[in-house]
Amino acid sequence: NSEALFLSATMPDYSKLFDKFLPDVNYNKLVTDRTNFKYFKKCEYKDMGKTSLETIAENASRCKNALIVVNTKKTSAELYSLVQGEKYYLSANMTPAHRSRVIEVVRNKLENGEHITVVSTSLVEAGVDLDFNTVFRQLSGLDSILQAGGRCNREGKDDKGYVYVFDIDETYRKGSDLAMRINKTKGLLEKYQDITSYDCIKEYYDGIFDFNQSRIAENSIAKYNEQSNSFDRQGLMSPYSIPFRSYAMQFEYISADTISIVIDDPNDQTCHELVETLRNGDMSVRRALQKYSVSIYMNVFKDLYSQGVLKDHGTGIFILVNQSYYNNETGL
């Protein structure tokens, strides 16, 4: 027997999924009284509609401090070049170690009340404890917008913080998950004055589940359990018959079209020593080097490799050997 506890600021209503795919699972909603939720509202969401990156950069520069979150690394790099004044950048083009250093600098600047602007992709929306007076979030899924809002007036130091949702001319693959979430959120921004309300969040996730019903059914654990006869006569699942290999093959958290490369940071003694250890053939440092690595698409990898700036020294782990390709502000 086991129990699972789901916690989120943007909690979906899983009852429809459980009832359909896991009908024998017992579940309870731990929070049913929402009357006091209003006391936790520390920011207000405003829809700016369609605008330009130049306008966003200009508006952010007028704020006490600001975080701008966009959907793609390409857009973040373009926006960062437009921002004036003291600015910082965060994206997956930077190694985890590099991002951690920047986050620590930003945190200190914010605590000292300094006027700064941070441009980031969605990675700042989870597990990053920063507190901004103002947040600008490019139109995305409602869950992403609300997570970005969690970085606004986080500690309640101001009477109210502001989250500005903006749209720009950007094309997404038709039928993609992001395109679907954006279209759903557009309608909710028009319909609801308060997009943090329970009804708004529920309608958003209901729409997401309805859109993805066939895909959920195709990839559900229940389907594989039925196919593999995982249940005994009492209807209990045997752990020895669970098709773990099938689950693993279906689950892809990181795209298979990417490859991780190590960035040898000459300014980081620990990183440099790990790289030297790897060059000497000691593969035990592979895990430690993950914090000094960046994942890139195969076409980018092939381009860098053809230029002779990636070497694996016979280890199968590629290292960027030309540091001019890695920017101290924006990464690779």
Regions found by a protein language model. Give the residues of each.
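Signature of the SF2 helicase/ATPase Hel1-core->accessory helical subdomain module
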Residues: S2-K20, D131-G161
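A short beta-strand-to-loop transition that corresponds to the Sensor-1 phosphate-sensing loop
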Residues: L7-M11, V70-K73, S120-L123, L139
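Short secondary-structure boundary/capping segments
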Residues: L17-D24, V83, T134, M180-I182
